[in-house]
Swiss-Prot record:
PANTHER family linked to this entry: UBIQUITIN-CONJUGATING ENZYME E2
CDD domains named among the record's database cross-references: UBCc_UBE2H
Positions annotated as active site in the UniProt record: 85
UniProt-annotated stretches for the region Disordered: 146-184
Principal EC category: transferase
BP GO annotations: protein polyubiquitination; ubiquitin-dependent protein catabolic process
Pfam families for this protein: UQ_con
Enzyme Commission number, as recorded: 2.3.2.23
Pathways per UniProt: Protein modification; protein ubiquitination
Gene name as annotated: UBC4
Name used for this protein in its record: Ubiquitin-conjugating enzyme E2-23 kDa
Organism annotation: Triticum aestivum (Wheat)
Length: 184
């Protein structure tokens, strides 16, 4: 396992063979989406988020960049950008960690044990410290509004349908141009 590119391929394959749905962006192995489910027995249970992952050329020596694409209410996640404030990923990353660790350990731990003293979402941190019940209700409301399976899948299906339609239309008009119109 000498080169970062081999390690990147191995880690990505391991992630794809796990229980996570992975959607590649473009043709490279540097950017992809992972469908992440909220941890069981938590206020995030039932939520499904599409997490964008970007691997640098230096991966696994440098941490991947991760961010939620659909909204999540959490003190350590920026509500607008989806950026994650996660010490393990941002500061203490080590090549011994892999992509599966992010989705099986780091993100579930972040959701289960938020750190309101180091917030990216000050409103969520403040509400969590002031009124835990109101905070939990708001998390559940966000899960209902923004983190259902249909919130992360339909646009992909629509894009595929549109592409299939344009491919079919292009094929038909191309045939007519080459062969001409049939004689009546």
């Amino acid at each position: 396992m000498s080169s970062p590119s081999k390690r990147r391929e191995m880690d990505l394959m391991k992630l794809m063979m796990s229980d996570y749905k992975v959607d590649m962006i473009n043709d490279g192995m540097h950017e992809f989406f992972v469908h992440f489910h909220g941890p069981k027995d938590s206020i995030y249970q039932g939520g499904v988020w599409k997490v964008r992952v970007e691997l640098t050329e230096a991966y696994p020596y440098k941490s991947p960049s991760i961010g939620f694409t659909n909204k999540i209410y959490h003190p350590n996640v920026d509500e607008m950008s989806g950026s994650v404030c996660l010490d393990v990923i941002n500061q203490t990353w080590s090549p011994m960690f892999d992509l599966v660790n992010i989705f099986e350990v780091f993100l579930p731990q972040l959701l289960l044990y938020p750190n309101p003293s180091d917030p990216l979402n000050g409103e969520a941190a403040s509400l969590m410290m002031r009124d835990k019940n109101a905070y939990e209700n708001k998390v559940k409301e966000y899960c209902e509004r923004y983190a259902k399976p249909e919130d992360i899948s339909p646009e992909e299906e629509e894009e595929e349908s549109d592409e299939e339609l344009s491919d079919a239309e292009g094929y038909d008009s191309g045939d007519e141009a080459i062969m001409g119109h049939a004689d009546p």
